Amino acid sequence: MIYELHVRDFSSDKSANFLLRGKFGAFCENRVTNGFSDTVGLDYIASLGVTHIHLLPVFDSQTIDENDPEAGFNWGYDPLNYNIPEGSYTTDPNNGTDRVRQFKELIHAVHQKGMGVIMDVVYNHTYSTEDSPFAKTFPEYYYRHNKDGSLSNGSACGNEFASERAMASRFIVDSLCYLAKEYKLDGFRFDLMGLLDIHTLNTAAEKLRRINPSIILYGEGWTGGKSPLPERLRAMKKNAVKLPQYAMFSDDFRDGVKGSVFEDEECGYVNGNASELSEMMKSVISGGIYRMDVQRKRSECWTDTPQQVVNYVEAHDNLTLFDKLRISMPEASGQERVSVDKLAAALVFLSQGIPFMQAGQEILRSKPSPDGGFVHDSYNSPDSVNSIKWNDVTIHRSVMEYYRGLIAIRKRFPEFRLRTAHDIRSRLEYEDLGGGALAVHYGDRLILVINPVETVLKYDPGRSAEIYADSKKADAQPLYRTKGAFAVKPHSIMLAGLN
């Protein structure tokens, strides 16, 4: 269970009593509480059942004044020096030793809570070109160019790092191995992985496994624009079979569940378009693998193993899930949107693949803009937009506890963590219930009933059952027992264990 988090967002809001706001050191603080005296911070994240914290870029970036970090904000996708921790997150940015030590202390603190640390890496481009260390070392060599000699821009950031060239490839591999070994990292997330070449990443994976056999590797299997790197060489979704040790974000899952991230008002399966997307849901619940009993083309199923799929409905990019629901469901009540949010979360945690969420998603995180709308990409928005509002842990406790319960259910039942396409095809069966509603049968042990519409759904499992999740609660221990048919409320699930 991956929890995506920006270092500064974690502790910058004054709703929690952090001492080292916006710093690596905030992760080392214990007994942090919000304005209602509820536990927040690292202890809280561990209590959710998170297994890995994915940190947005923590290497040295270019656009933040390290001696005056509050003068600006950036996610960190503006690389300067890849192998040095960002100084603005330390108590003394002018002391190189402090950068290293304080980042190591963060990682140690996370490990002490039983979680791993995944580092977001951005090898696909550098913030500047002519002034970058690579251009000064060997002009032209480290960057891709178009046929007319201009810099290519598949990153949409001004340049592309030529990973396929021998010394560029070696730099990436050496950098990853250094970071994994020196900082005891547990994984890497690759920004715009489709701009990196397959050979480099496979070489890196082989060497990284020697350092940490359980290391997690995943990324964005696409580009940000046209690139001269031939498609057959790109580390992208269509080439996933050539990258067996890497998982990739499933934009099919993301957009299928809630609607396109590029069309704010477009609805997905959970918020208004269920009947048209029920076959898509069968596919993504199965981990995106090809199934003859699901109406989806084999060419659209880009992997044959759930271990290559990262399922999510919210990340740092684009609108938060709850903001998307506000825009795409303008006539719905606040409680209806909360129900839809919980339904989307259930699909993330109870589908085959790797579940991923953005920090604060479980407390209905929102990024309102001053003009009354919502910020799509808050990469340079102020702390007032980006910070986690820790009082929401208390205000939205029921939603948070629902997420926590779903995570616990996933951990208890191996049916939600199948490892091969054969197991998925043989153990998951789908039953169409009309209007896009589905029942997912996991052998004769579990039934997951999904009701994405606005009316109550009656379902009879044919046997007595123990209910683990309904519209209000989710838990790894049975909530109650039923005999005969049960009612599944609008925009919700029922998870039943059969007796």
Predicted regions and their residues:
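Short catalytic-loop micro-motif centered on adjacent basic/acidic residues
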Residues: 187-193
